[in-house]
Regions:
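Short beta-strand-to-turn element immediately C-terminal to the catalytic PLP-Schiff-base lysine
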Residues: 100-102, 142, 168-172, 185-187, ...
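A short core secondary-structure module
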Residues: 147, 151-196
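Long, acidic (Asp/Glu-rich), low-complexity accessory segments flanking structured domains
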Residues: 215-233
Length: 379
């Protein structure tokens, strides 16, 4: 395995780092506190090409590989995880499946405006009664001949209120179980679609999360993604790739917390010497640095597997499991190293700690990742 990043990768990483430092850092505490959606920053991500990174140039995207995408998510996550999850959900959950499984007509109509950031996408899978178990879809899309009628409620939808385009997973044939599930791509302004209030969350507070309600929504047959009954597989393959983005997010926020803790430990003095000179603190920093590097290797391996068209479901689950657990552990340690200062918003690390928790939950909980990994091991 080649551990060296190419010149192109280094340039992409630097561009994302510069954007995060120069355009995201200012105001990030206030946006988090007010649950304020980063309108200006999302527009800039579109202008810089971050909202269509992996979409082929044919459809207006950057045509970049998954490593490039992971590097960008990592750098942005060091500063603003709300922006990184907006980026991740748009690229991994909305754009990817349309390009992979959509018709040329669907790509022209829906993917192109997503790839250039003219429109924002959202993925509607989770429901009030089915989070981890995606086979139990209560939202229905009943075949009426030349169209489907969509009814149901989706919740925890990232970009829900701001999205122009929804990818929706729904049950069309209860008798067939998960083989009766379909995937659809729908304009958010279609009659019968409404949104619940923005969720007041523990972390990633300036990102947009809400319920989306579908009431007698008419969906043309040409809006179905993939063949009849393909929806469950569509959702699972989408999540496999999405987990690489979440793992990169966890890696980035852990690294951001580590860098802040390292710098603080060198400046803060106790008992006549810097905190970093106390073995208890130095050992914490050593553990953080080692675990971050291990997570990076897992993230990059899963990204390389995806780019080489190898089976990446197993490696992406490992990357997400390890990176998210590591991020939660070490953001707590970063707060501890900061002492009382770590408990106030001014020092950023408390926000990263709050942001870390969701990486253990969305796009498959840590427990779900262990199920996926253990099934592969015991197959």
């Amino acid at each position: 395995m080649n551990f060296e990043l190419s010149e192109e990768h280094l340039m992409i990483r630097q561009a994302a780092r510069d954007f995060a430092q120069n355009e995201l850092k200012e105001g990030v505490i206030e946006r988090d506190s007010k649950c304020e959606y980063p309108e200006k920053q999302v527009k800039r991500m579109a202008e810089l090409g971050f909202l269509g990174m992996t979409v082929s140039t044919k459809y207006g995207g950057g045509g970049m590989d998954t490593i490039s995408y992971a590097l960008a998510v990592e750098e942005i996550s060091k500063i603003d995880n709300s922006c990184s999850v907006i980026l991740s959900a748009h690229n991994s959950l909305a754009c990817w499946g349309i390009e992979e499984y959509g018709t040329e007509e669907q790509k022209e109509k829906f993917l192109k405006p997503l790839a250039i950031g003219k429109k924002i996408g959202a993925f509607c899978l989770s429901e009030p009664e089915s989070g981890s178990d995606a086979t139990q879809q209560k939202t229905t899309a009943i075949d009426k001949g030349d169209h489907y009628v969509l009814n149901g409620v989706k919740n925890w939808i990232t970009n829900g209120l701001k999205a122009d385009i929804y990818v929706v997973i729904a049950q069309s044939n209860l008798d067939l179980g998960h083989r009766g599930i379909n995937a659809f791509v729908i304009d958010s302004d279609t009659n019968g679609i409404s949104c619940g209030p923005k969720e007041d969350k523990l972390g990633i507070r300036s990102s947009d999360t809400c319920s989306v309600i579908f009431q007698d929504v008419i969906v043309p047959k040409e809006n179905r993604l993939g063949p009849e009954g393909f929806g469950f597989k569509y959702a699972m393959k989408t999540l496999e790739g999405g987990r690489i983005g979440i793992a990169a997010q966890a890696l980035g926020l852990a690294e951001g917390a580590y860098e802040m803790a390292l710098e603080y430990s060198k400046q803060r003095k106790t008992f006549g010497k810097p905190l970093s000179q106390h073995q208890g603190i130095a050992f914490k920093l050593a553990d953080m640095a080692t675990d971050i590097e291990a997570a990076r290797l897992l993230v990059h391996k899963s990204a390389i597997n995806k780019d080489k068209n190898l089976d990446y479901g197993y490696s992406s689950s490992m990357a997400k499991l390890y990176a998210s657990e590591m991020a939660m552990k070490h953001t707590v340690e970063a707060v501890q190293i900061h002492g009382g200062n770590g408990f106030v918003k001014e020092y950023h690390v408390e926000r990263l700690m709050r942001d870390a928790k969701i990486t253990q939950i969305y796009e498959g909980t840590s427990e779900i990742q262990k199920i996926i990994i253990s099934r592969k091991l015991l197959k």
